[in-house]
A protein has these predicted regions:
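Bacterial Sec-dependent N-terminal signal peptides
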Residues: 8-38
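Extended, low-polarity segments enriched in aliphatic/aromatic residues
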Residues: 44-82, 86-99, 104-253
Length: 253
């Protein structure tokens, strides 16, 4: 039974990882399309077609090959953004898969608290979930909104004028975004865009995105949900705020 379960988990991980690579490619293309608006920390002055790198087998070694192929080195104080996963849920990246990459870039795994009940709605419970899922065994884990939030400007936003992220996020020099494919009741599915928009947003910032800018209250948000398109556009606007903040100091896997 254990052997069968391991094989099943491998097949699922393989499919999720390939979806994540595709999500990275989509985000790269999207970022290229908005690059012309310019930011203080961007260095590229022209659009460059995104390259998509695929691997046939999911392994720590091949994950490193993907990182090397991107040609962008994570330097300075590095944040590794991933989803720690709800307690009792096994739909998160296997720490054994990402350990080599996280430690190579000397990264800190970062997350923010959720805007719903669950097991990650406060810092104490969230850190326990991260420990139970094996993330604290491979790297430091920081819940970025443990001490509050800061805002990033949303340039040209239709619904949002600012994006409220964990207070600790601006302390990092570089962001490595590790995403996996997962379902989302409002978005259909989640990937890299969700990972850096809702994922980097503080708990109240998550409420702000989900409500398309109507409220920051985690108690009120679920009664003030906007049309789906407004939510999706707000999620993209929040992702753009993070991408603008980072410029070239971010990569997606």
């Amino acid at each position: 039974m254990e052997c069968k379960m391991s094989f099943f988990k491998y097949r699922v991980m393989k499919r999720l990882f390939l979806f994540a690579v595709c999500a990275w490619a989509g985000l790269s293309l999207w970022a290229s399309s908005v690059k012309g608006q310019g930011t203080a920390c961007e260095t590229r002055s022209e659009k460059v077609p995104a390259k998509v790198y695929m691997i046939k087998e999911i392994s720590p070694e091949n994950l490193m090959k993907v990182y090397e192929a991107l040609g962008r080195k994570a330097t300075g104080k590095v944040a590794v953004k991933l989803s720690t996963g709800e307690p009792g849920n096994n739909n998160y990246l296997d720490p054994a898969l990402i350990k080599g990459l996280v430690q190579k870039v000397d990264g800190t795994i970062v997350e923010c608290n959720t805007a719903y009940g669950g097991g990650r709605s406060d810092t104490e419970k969230h850190l326990k979930a991260a420990k139970d899922h094996g993330f604290t065994a491979i790297a430091p884990v920081v819940i970025m909104d443990a001490d509050g939030e800061v805002s990033l400007p949303v340039k040209g936003g239709k619904h949002l004028k600012e994006d409220f992220v964990g207070k600790a996020y601006p302390e990092y020099d570089f962001t490595v975004v590790l995403s996996h494919f997962k379902g989302h009741p409002m978005g259909g599915f989640g990937g890299a865009i969700k990972n850096i928009s809702i994922g980097i947003a503080s708990s109240s910032g998550k409420a702000y995105i989900h409500s398309a800018g109507k409220t920051k209250s985690v108690k009120e948000v679920w009664g003030k949900l906007p049309p789906q398109d407004d939510f999706l556009e707000s999620m993209a606007e929040a992702a753009k705020a993070v991408a603008d903040h980072c410029g070239d100091r971010i990569l997606y896997i």
